[in-house]
A protein has these predicted regions:
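Alpha-helical segment of the N-proximal tetratricopeptide repeat
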Residues: 26-53, 57
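Terminal, low-structured helical/coil segments at or just beyond the last alpha-helical repeat
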Residues: 150, 157, 161, 165-217
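TPR alpha-solenoid repeat register
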Residues: 64, 97-98, 105, 139, ...
Length: 217
């Protein structure tokens, strides 16, 4: 009798364990988190698959579109990156995710449009991101969660390049000044005479210098 009772208890426990295992499945957050791990390791082809699965699981999961957009950027699928980021920007934030995903999407849109030479769009999204950063309480900075070498200074330099391309030299200089001040608060004002060819050449050289400097950090 005692043996039968123990056997019955064992069967019940095994059944419960099996049922729990069947009920568990990866959530969209699990998929995206693994996608980001792969992204950080440089495995962009596989990260693409995991981010794609995340948004199949939940078509409103903003960070899935964020990850997929950045992955498309790494795969040099720039039009796809822009389209994916744009969809992600329209999705609601997930309150369980501490990262400001909208800021990461705006940065992604800024860089993708820059690579596509769409300067007006660079300014639209880049200025929007800088505005949001400046509304923050405390430190007015932004760093990409999944690559700390990419931050708000890259956004400023990208904006400087696009403003230069559109012949808005005053705004280009202002963005260069923002970078210089962030790197060294004691740096003197950046002054260049952009009414002359030589002055514009100096500004272009400064933009290129800062781009290379920030890449090499």
């Amino acid at each position: 009798m005692r043996y039968n009772r123990l056997l019955l208890q064992l069967i019940v426990l095994i059944s419960l364990f099996a049922a729990c295992r069947k009920q568990w499945s990866a959530t969209e957050e699990d998929m995206a988190n693994y996608g980001w791990s792969l992204y950080e390791q440089g495995d962009y082809v596989t990260s693409y698959e995991w981010f794609s699965n995340a948004i199949i699981e939940d078509k409103n999961f903003q960070d899935g579109y964020n990850g997929l957009g950045w992955t498309f950027g790494k795969l040099v699928e720039l039009d796809s990156a822009v389209q994916t980021f744009a969809i992600g920007l329209s999705k609601p934030p997930n309150e369980r995710i501490a990262t400001n995903v909208s800021q990461e999407i705006l940065a992604g849109l800024t860089f993708a449009h820059s690579a596509l030479k769409k300067d007006s769009s660079v300014i639209l999204y880049g200025d929007s991101l800088i505005w949001l950063i400046n509304q923050q309480i405390g430190e007015k900075t932004w760093t990409f969660t999944h690559d700390s070498t990419t931050n708000y200074l890259d956004v400023y330099v990208t904006l400087a390049l696009s403003y230069y391309a559109l012949s808005d030299y005053e705004e280009s200089v202002a963005n260069i000044q923002a970078v210089k001040t962030a790197l060294n608060p004691a740096s003197p004002p950046y002054i260049v005479n952009t009414t002359t060819v030589r002055g514009r050449e100096e500004l272009a050289a400064e933009i290129e210098y800062l781009q290379n400097f920030l890449r090499g950090r």
